[in-house]
Swiss-Prot record:
It comes from Thiobacillus denitrificans (strain ATCC 25259 / T1). This is UPF0301 protein Tbd_2579. One of its GO terms (cellular component) is cytosol. Belongs to the UPF0301 (AlgH) family. InterPro entries: AlgH-like.
């Protein structure tokens, strides 16, 4: 498991996940190396909408985006925005994950959205999920997560409550059939 790279994969929290930050979550891994991993939870809306967030940071929001929600991205730096979006636009702090997904943490992406010049598809999260070197690999060995190659349509085209079941379907598994008991062959 040491040589596995989970960049551009989903992590599906197993039913027995005891950490309330991740119970029932689908996390998109933006970067994974021997230094650790960085991901964003993509299926946990918080009690904040995009129009309120934009108002708080002094930006106007185009009319068609007023109902959009903000997500809990993870328990690290929860006061900071993390925007998953489609390329090709890049901003001052954009990490291009692949040709379908980028991650930006600088305010200029939100300024572009405010001006109607932002990415075609995006979700805004507060916070991120981070793992130190070897930590994610250890959690995988302990059966805390399932992993599957990510499909950007799950992130950008489905409602939050549809994302976890859709990721499970990529594995060919019905989430309801999973046990919270760990086992090893």
């Amino acid at each position: 498991m040491e040589n596995v790279n989970l960049t551009n994969h989903f992590l599906i929290a197993m039913p027995g996940m005891v950490d309330p930050n991740f119970n029932g979550t689908l996390t998109y891994i933006c970067d994974h190396s021997d230094q650790g991993a960085l991901g964003v939870v993509v299926n946990r809306p918080i009690d904040l909408d995009l129009s309120t967030l934009f108002e708080q940071i002094g930006l106007s929001l185009p009319e068609g985006l007023h109902g959009e929600i903000v997500y809990f991205g993870g328990p690290v730096q929860t006061e900071r925005g993390f925007v998953l979006h489609t390329p090709p636009l890049t901003f001052s702090s954009t990490l291009t994950v692949n040709d379908a997904v980028s991650l930006t943490t600088s305010k200029d992406v939100l300024e572009a959205v405010s001006q109607g010049a932002g990415p075609e598809k995006f979700i805004v999260s507060l916070g991120y999920a981070g793992w130190s070197a070897g930590q994610l690999e250890d959690e995988l060995k302990q059966n805390a997560w399932l992993s599957v190659a990510a499909d950007p349509q799950v992130i950008f085209d489905l409602a939050p409550e549809e994302r976890l079941p859709a990721a499970m379907k990529l594995l060919g598994i019905d989430f309801a059939s999973l046990s919270d008991e760990a086992g090893h062959a």
